[in-house]
A protein has these predicted regions:
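A broad structural signal for alpha-helix termini and local helix breaks/kinks
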Residues: 80-81, 138, 255
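N-terminal signal peptide c-region/cleavage motif recognized by signal peptidases
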Residues: 14-16
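Conformational coupling and interaction surfaces
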Residues: 20-21, 41-49, 53, 173-176, ...
Length: 322
């Protein structure tokens, strides 16, 4: 309770800005070998973006277990959150698995406290269990969420395959891990923008990009150092031209939307639990906005933002003892 009170007090002090108010839900796993790093790229991009004001972060399972994602989120905020006026008191643990759907958590309590005071855009970088739980617990507050931006959705029959022979396949992870939660959010009729994995797979960083980030110091150096094994996996095992930072693209609708191709589409849950997106209205579908592509400038924009110099008081980029 004390932590929640401190969090609300910090929030009230920050309410004077004109930046868009967002809540970010993340399964960040940077710092562990062979884990995805794209959530961390997305979070640092958000920290460095004056167009948005982050009112809180919730953690969820997905890329790693909840305890690990919560530690990673707090570590990242402690290092680089100062630029966004964030402290570890802004990070709340949520669902540990799909079986936690509907179960109250620190994340659901904190989001409720926020929405009692103001509306937010909810950016979901992981499975939708936390948001669906909130909607089940507080259905009358759904209209307090102005929009959901979600990394998920796919065209029917499309396989997410990578590499020169298209032999490395992945599923639509955030949907796959809790399709029931995805269905709950879809039925809520909150305005929904989808940033599909298939689209984000084209936003690649390579060795030259990591060296550029390393030279910039601060958060860029940290991301570069912690992404080396991840990049090796994508370039040597999957044999792509770089590593995809899927989740970073989900921040761009709030910062540089003109860089994106966003089209009106229709989404529904199919019998297999997939979030299917089509250009034509089908039975049981609802309208969504779908990110189908992005301008070449998008990668340059992301890299520039990641390289912003840390403000006075930010933690050093060298890895802390784990």
């Amino acid at each position: 309770m004390r932590k929640l009170c401190v969090f609300i007090a910090i929030l009230c002090l920050a309410c004077g800005t004109h930046a868009a108010t967002v809540w970010i839900d993340t399964d960040v796993s940077i710092g562990s070998p062979f884990r995805e790093v794209d959530d961390a790229f997305a979070l640092v991009l958000a920290f460095h973006s004056p167009e948005i004001r982050i009112t809180g972060l919730s953690t969820t399972y997905g890329n790693a277990p909840l305890g690990q994602t919560t530690r990673a989120a707090r570590d990242l905020v402690q290092r680089f959150g100062r630029s966004a006026d964030l402290t570890v008191d802004h990070v709340f643990a949520g669902a540990g698995s799909a079986s936690d759907l509907g179960r109250r958590s620190g994340a659901s309590d904190a989001l409720t406290a926020i929405l009692q005071k103001q509306k937010v855009t909810y950016i979901a970088l992981g499975p939708l269990t936390n948001l669906a739980t909130f909607l089940q617990l507080h259905p009358k507050m759904a209209n307090r969420i102005e929009r959901v931006i979600f990394v998920g959705g796919q065209a029917p029959g499309v396989s997410l395959a990578f590499g020169p022979t298209r032999s490395f396949h992945i599923h639509d992870a955030n949907v796959f891990k809790d399709s029931a939660a995805t269905g709950t959010v879809l039925r809520s009729n909150i305005p929904l923008t989808l940033v599909p994995t298939a689209t984000g797979s084209h936003l690649l960083v390579d060795g030259a990009d990591l060296r550029q980030l390393e030279r910039s110091g601060g958060a860029g150096n940290y991301l570069s150092h912690e992404s080396r094994i991840w990049l090796w996996f994508w370039t040597h095992f999957v044999k792509t031209n770089g590593g995809p930072i899927f989740d970073a693209l989900a921040i761009v609708p709030m910062t540089r939307p003109e860089l994106l191709s966003i089209k009106k589409r229709y989404a529904r849950m199919d019998e297999a639990g997939n979030l299917v997106v089509t250009p034509r209205l089908t039975n049981g579908a609802r309208t969504v906005r779908d990110c189908t592509g992005f301008a070449l400038e998008t990668k340059r924009f992301v890299l520039r933002r990641l390289q912003q110099a840390p403000r006075k008081g930010e933690a050093p980029a060298e890895p802390l003892g784990r």
